[in-house]
UniProtKB/Swiss-Prot annotation:
The gene is clpX. SUPFAM superfamilies: Glucocorticoid receptor-like (DNA-binding domain), P-loop containing nucleoside triphosphate hydrolases. Belongs to the ClpX chaperone family. GO terms for cellular component: HslUV protease complex. It comes from Cereibacter sphaeroides (strain ATCC 17025 / ATH 2.4.3) (Rhodobacter sphaeroides). The lineage of its organism: Bacteria, Pseudomonadati, Pseudomonadota, Alphaproteobacteria, Rhodobacterales. This is ATP-dependent Clp protease ATP-binding subunit ClpX.
């Protein structure tokens, strides 16, 4: 018996990659001198699939074309065509500049981007989608939490630490990443005149951001927190990091309108009432001087040469956001109900009513989820305990009047109820 077991172990074949025996896997494929199991083949396919996905958009010089970038942005962000074109060209030129930096004596300067638009219009989503398209490390920072070095709050260089963490501490990858700084309109100077007292969360933060946005070698403590002399630091060159700043800039439209008031003089001049124009229309007339009046310092405005303005989302755009993108809210909730074995349907009137509520709240696309949660909360609470429900229909009454969505039961359940009665 001992000899038989010994000969069996000699005849057992093993995967040359993971070491599993032929009895532990479904299939073992033989090569000239090696074997590979089905599990290792699947793993290799996954790796190749990921590599293909990340390089699929790359053009001949390794950078997607502006048209390709814009096409992918269209899948996730509804409307905002002008902003998407501006971003696509700026990002394409930025990474083209990196790939061809040593091929000529002409030095191409970096073009950081400023996104201006009302709350919930897609600023953050645009930045996140760009990073995904380009397969580069991406991090977000909230400008309102930042303070000058030495004061209580988050140090500006912590932004670079977050980017390092996103790149798994690969310094080279981090140096080609994208940083999105949100709420940048909240760090404006508190008055038009330079102050004699320290403004550590306003102008002071703008001054601190200038260095890393223009390009400097930042000394970043690997564990974060405040610096001390005994620490080891990671050196990160920020010259090639693309900075995208975003903000709602509430009140900026009034500054633009005020500047435009004096444009119409004489009998033939067309005088347009500023109040009759929407915020988005006024933003298209933005000049750097308007940002200075708003409270950004000249040096900070100078570091953001590319400005993309986004408009308010109208009713039709919000309905499209609810239904069409790959990760549309309606699709997400339909998937949740599908897990329970129930079909979720929204009537056209219901979708329009949801869009109208979001416009009334002035929260843009960001407010759509909270409205959907309000409508479906009771149904999602009760549904797991109900039997025989095959469909839930959300109509206009459920949105506007607070009525419960309609529950449609299977024929079997109806017959049971009829028999019981």
């Amino acid at each position: 018996m001992a000899n038989n077991s010994g000969s069996d172990s000699k005849n057992t074949l093993y995967c040359s990659f993971c070491g599993k025996s032929q009895h532990e896997v479904r299939k073992l494929i033989a090569g000239p001198t090696v074997f590979i199991c089905d599990e290792c083949v699947e793993l290799c396919m996954d790796i190749i699939r990921e590599e293909t996905k990340s390089t699929g958009l790359k053009s001949a010089d390794g950078v997607p074309t502006p048209r390709e970038i814009c096409k992918v942005l269209d899948d996730y962000v509804i409307g905002q065509m002008h902003a998407k074109r501006v971003l696509s060209v700026a990002v394409h030129n930025h990474y083209k500049r990196l790939n061809h930096s040593s091929k000529n004596d002409i030095e191409l300067s970096k073009s950081n981007i400023l996104l201006i638009g009302p709350t919930g219009c897609g600023k953050t989503l645009l930045a996140q989608t760009l990073a995904r398209i380009l397969d580069v490390p991406f991090t977000m920072a909230d400008a309102t939490t930042l303070t000058e070095a030495g004061y209580v709050g988050e140090d500006v260089e912590n932004i670079i630490l977050k980017l390092l963490q996103a790149s798994e501490y690969n310094v080279e990858r981090a140096q080609r990443g994208i940083v999105y700084i949100d709420e940048v309109d909240k760090i404006t100077r508190k008055s038009d005149n330079p102050s004699i007292t320290r403004d550590v969360s306003g102008e002071g933060v703008q001054q601190a951001l200038l260095k890393i946005m223009e390009g400097t070698v930042a000394s970043v403590p690997p564990q974060g927190g405040r610096k001390h002399p005994q620490q080891e630091f990671l050196q990160v060159d920020t010259t090639n990091i693309l900075f995208i700043c975003g903000g709602a800039f509430a009140g900026l439209e009034k500054i633009i309108a005020q500047r435009g008031k004096g444009s119409g003089i004489g009998f033939g001049a067309e005088v347009k009432d500023p109040d009759s124009r929407g915020v988005g229309e006024l933003f298209t007339e933005l000049e750097p001087e308007d940002l200075l009046k708003f409270g950004l310092i000249p040096e900070f405005v100078g570091r953001l040469p590319v400005i993309a303005t986004l408009t308010d989302l109208d009713e039709a755009a919000l309905v499209t956001i609810l239904t069409e993108p790959k990760n549309a809210l309606v699709k997400q909730y339909q998937r949740l109900f599908e897990i329970e074995g129930v079909k979720l349907t929204f009537t056209a009137d219901a979708l329009t009513a949801i869009a109208k509520r979001a416009i009334k709240r002035k929260t843009g696309a960001r407010g759509l989820r909270s409205i959907m949660e309000d409508i479906l909360l009771d149904t999602m609470f009760e549904l797991p305990g109900l039997e025989g429900v095959e469909e839930v229909v959300v109509n206009e009454e459920a949105v506007n009047s607070g009525a419960k969505p309609l529950l449609i039961y299977t024929e079997v359940t109806k017959k049971k109820d009829a028999t019981a009665s």
